[in-house]
Amino acid sequence: MPKKSHIKKVLIIGSGPIQIGQAAEFDFSGSQACRALREEGVEVVLVNSNPATIQTDPDTADVIYIEPLKAELIAKIIAKEKPDGILSGMGGQTGLNMTAELAEMGALEGVEILGTPLEAIYRGEDREQFRDLMNAIGEPVPRSMILEHMNQIDEAIREVGLPAIIRPAYTLGGSGGGVAHTPEEMRRICELGLARSRIHQVLVEESVAGWKEIEFEVMRDAADTCIIVCGMENVDPMGIHTGESVVVAPILTLRDDEFQTLRTAAIKIIRALDVQGGCNIQFAYKDGDYRIIEVNPRVSRSSALASKATGYPIARVAAKIAIGLRLDEIMNTVTGVTPASFEPAIDYVVVKVPRWPFDKFKSADRTLTTAMKSTGEVMAIGRTVEEAFKKALRSLDNDMQQHTNPSEIRMILTSPTDERFGCLFDAFREGFTVREIAELTAITPFFLEKIKNIVDLERKLETDFEPEDVRVARRSGFSDEDLLALTKKTAGEIEALGGTPTYKMVDTCAAEFPATTPYFYSTWEEGCELVRDSAKKVLILGSGPIRIGQGIEFDYCTVHAVMALREEEGIEVHIVNNNPETVSTDADTSDRLFFEPMQLEDVMNILKKDDYYGVMVQFGGQNSVNLAVPLEAEIRRLDLPTKILGTSPDAMDAAEDRDRFSRLLTRLEIPSPANSSAYSEEEAREMAGEIGYPVLVRPSYVLGGRAMELVHDEAELESYIKEAVRVSRKHPVLIDSFLQNAVEIDVDAVSDGTDVLIGGIMEHIEWAGVHSGDSACVIPPQSLTPSVIARVRDYTKKIALGLGVVGLINIQYAVRNDVVYVLEANPRASRTVPFVAKATGIALAKIAAKVMVGRKLADMGVAEPEIEHVAVKEVLLPFNKLPGVDTVLGPEMKSTGEVMGIDYDFGRAYYKACTAADNTLPTTGNVFISVTDEQKEELLPVARKLRELGLSLYGTSGTVDFLTQNGVEANLVRKVQEGSPNVIDAMRSGSIRLIINTPADKASRQDHIQIMRAAVDYGIPYITTLQAARAAAMAIDAIKREEITIEPLGHYHGLM
């Protein structure tokens, strides 16, 4: 079938910022789709708000817009670019929602919807239309009722019964949904679900909790050829969102006739929807009976997993199908000889385990339900289920608490939390049987037997074992670290037992055809498929699962390093990573991909298999950097012909070690806040007293400010120290003087050991004290004096050269009373590197990679950027997905993702950034303000400005009295505890359009938390710092005076 010859230009809508339910998988799929369409000569216009994506790179698409993903703005881009088609299925739920909205507002006249037709979007996303379609084609769905008004609750309970599952239409990651066991729960979940749904609709359906959950990834072309790319089976039963479940591929517990029944149904459904491209279909299955649960008529999170599990490039194939190609006309890039119409075959086991953020959010509700809470996931490949399970757990890279109390174990098994998968192992260790656990969890006994096999092996290794038992353990995924702990043998004795892992290839065809894209996993079988060669090779350590503090930004840096090194003649680039969502784990990103845990032992096994010129650790974030020192020690011990490239591990340690770094700053005559390191509680008390409260306390070697806190007195310090020491047992507690009312600055730079290139100086909107990852920031700085900027440049160069940095460095400063203080230096990639690249056009990560293999900055001819526009980075906070989380921003990071606003002045750029972060600032209506007594004087100019702009002010008694006394009109509204009607009632009614609420202290946080929770639930923009309120007033002022600019990114960089 010929390509659609009239499709010359296609618009792809990205998925926006990383958030719970929608992570890096859509950068992976969107980037793949852009490349696929450009291969076919189609011009690609891409719009996305997330600067930390590969798809927003200038060489991914022909025209790139970094703009808020709002239908009215995308409509302007469509009018300007005049695309022939729009590809909606690559941007996740956001892309589908935007396409539906654009169609409804008439913006798609003359624009063909490619791949997923509009009717399929409606039938897949509108719960009533989906149910009607399934009934029409004779496919069973759970008994259900559509609910659009709260007065239908009693009828829904009578019709469907309890427990019931609530599924809102057009939402992401099950947002706003849940399982209701009582009428009260039903009312609470339905109210939230209706508020979150784009069309104010929820489906209340009978619960099939406890049934098996099975997924099929299906592909279909215009000639009606359908294939199953991958079947996947959730270890967790129905009742837990698939994104929260442990997932196994291929399907292992269905008989062939059962599998064929579901396969036939999946193909029937994709045909009924008329989807041309990829589609994800979810089934509930029990004892020969099944129900259709959900259809995603787009590339999804499960698509990314299926793609990495099989090696089949789903997004690439779907994009080519969308412009008219048949499956048999599209080549499988992994084999290079088979068409995409061949169903993939796999001869190994893949396991996905989610990564949850509860190490950051101690107060969050950890219960797993139908709404997602995980931020990322890991994938492991093994020859057996046991091996894949063990490798997946190792890949999570977090401390799993062991449970020994049978009552506690029973509670976790019956009311699942993020601890349940690990607790299955604990249950067997404490003597639970397979039958008992199956009854408590509804998990298929097959998987429980595999976990029991692992625990039985542990017992054998702890007692009397034979060398053969060690070999069996290794084939079951046990690491050398596991073996040392269990056998109590020395490393030498374990090594003497012999054996090294072999590497097998993921090739989509179970070795039926040779693969041209080398994609490997380790196992302890015979026959290694990895071939040693003489090429000059570099191994880059990836960043692992997305978590708070370590997001897609580090994958961006990893991919840029690969791109840069592949431009250098004669360098072969290999990646090790375990995140199935990312571009770096796309099989054709690097010359060789290893899907492995990011542990010292696993990395060393790779290095021992081939001669590597060097290893790069600074692009994968703090976790990769933490491997630098032990990796170098092992390389030396084994006398391997490789080295850590770029900044030396000793220099990294000098930046992390507080005492060494302080001595360097003293020698360079650069100011820093008074600080010290304490190795005991007593030392900490003494040093905090000497420095003077308030102090900032944190463990050393942390990621994203983990366990960092602002401490005001000795009592707070004592309660904190226990937590900090537990988080980082091997390292001291760091105590810093807290600089109140200071402006914070971030700098990203590259050094080659001789020269330093400063890529960007970013001024934070929020003052020091809010974690840099949670603060909005702006390039170029808006309030810093030339003298301050000159000192920041000078200090950056001195520190980079003083540490001996070769590659990237990020330095954080605070400015108070015209003094520039250094807060910390990180000689590695930072989360702001992609933002700097998109704001300035300078690809720092690429430059750094070249410097690390010997290139000099002077030879590259890269000048420090000077820009005439303004770019603002704003963050996305996860409070709408994590009930119970404290919404107060502080020194510990909470955001999951970021967006960028770009325009020709600060006000409009900040307005765009807030809009992109789903915090759109109102230009009319009522603003509720509540601030501390200390902040009231600072509030006054902001309040006056908002009144000048025509907004009405509301507040509680203290704030209203102060404003009125100072000539600013304000209206009184009651506090929550003062009875109704109060501020929450006003928010619920829709009369409040913006919240400015800064909590005074821990005692006043309860009011703040209630107000902020209501703001999140009812979608009201909120501001928690006065600095952000000041910026918001500037943004509203700017937007009322002048329209925002809609221009391609290339225009800002002078490339178009």
Swiss-Prot record:
Alphabetized UniProt keyword annotations: Amino-acid biosynthesis, Arginine biosynthesis, ATP-binding, Ligase, Magnesium, Manganese, Metal-binding, Nucleotide-binding, Pyrimidine biosynthesis, Repeat
Region (Carboxyphosphate synthetic domain) location: 1-397
Residue ranges of the region described as Allosteric domain: 921-1056
Binding site for Mg(2+) 3: Q812, E824
Family: Belongs to the CarB family.
Residue positions binding ATP 2: R698, S737, L739, E744, G769, V770, H771, S772, Q812, E824
Binding site for Mn(2+) 4: E824, N826
Chain residues that bind Mn(2+) 3: Q812, E824
Binding site for Mn(2+) 2: E294, N296
Location of the region described as Oligomerization domain in the Swiss-Prot/TrEMBL record: 398-530
Keyword Ribonucleoprotein in annotation: no
Catalytic activity: hydrogencarbonate + L-glutamine + 2 ATP + H2O = carbamoyl phosphate + L-glutamate + 2 ADP + phosphate + 2 H(+)
Entry's free-text remark on domains: The large subunit is composed of 2 ATP-grasp domains that are involved in binding the 2 ATP molecules needed for carbamoyl phosphate synthesis. The N-terminal ATP-grasp domain (referred to as the carboxyphosphate synthetic component) catalyzes the ATP-dependent phosphorylation of hydrogencarbonate to carboxyphosphate and the subsequent nucleophilic attack by ammonia to form a carbamate intermediate.
GO molecular function, one term: carbamoyl-phosphate synthase (glutamine-hydrolyzing) activity
Function comment: Large subunit of the glutamine-dependent carbamoyl phosphate synthetase (CPSase). CPSase catalyzes the formation of carbamoyl phosphate from the ammonia moiety of glutamine, carbonate, and phosphate donated by ATP, constituting the first step of 2 biosynthetic pathways, one leading to arginine and/or urea and the other to pyrimidine nucleotides.
GO biological process: 'de novo' UMP biosynthetic process; glutamine metabolic process; L-arginine biosynthetic process
Pfam families tied to this protein: CPSase_L_D2, CPSase_L_D3, MGS
Entry keyword annotation includes Amino-acid biosynthesis: yes
Cofactor: Mg(2+); Mn(2+)
SUPFAM superfamilies from the UniProt entry: Carbamoyl phosphate synthetase, large subunit connection domain, Glutathione synthetase ATP-binding domain-like, Methylglyoxal synthase-like, PreATP-grasp domain
Subunit structure: Composed of two chains; the small (or glutamine) chain promotes the hydrolysis of glutamine to ammonia, which is used by the large (or ammonia) chain to synthesize carbamoyl phosphate. Tetramer of heterodimers (alpha,beta)4.
Full protein name: Carbamoyl phosphate synthase large chain
InterPro entries: ATP-grasp, CarbamoylP_synth_lsu, CarbamoylP_synth_lsu_oligo, CarbamoylP_synth_lsu_oligo_sf, CbamoylP_synth_lsu-like_ATP-bd, CbamoylP_synth_lsu_CPSase_dom, MGS-like_dom, MGS-like_dom_sf
GO cellular component entries: cytoplasm
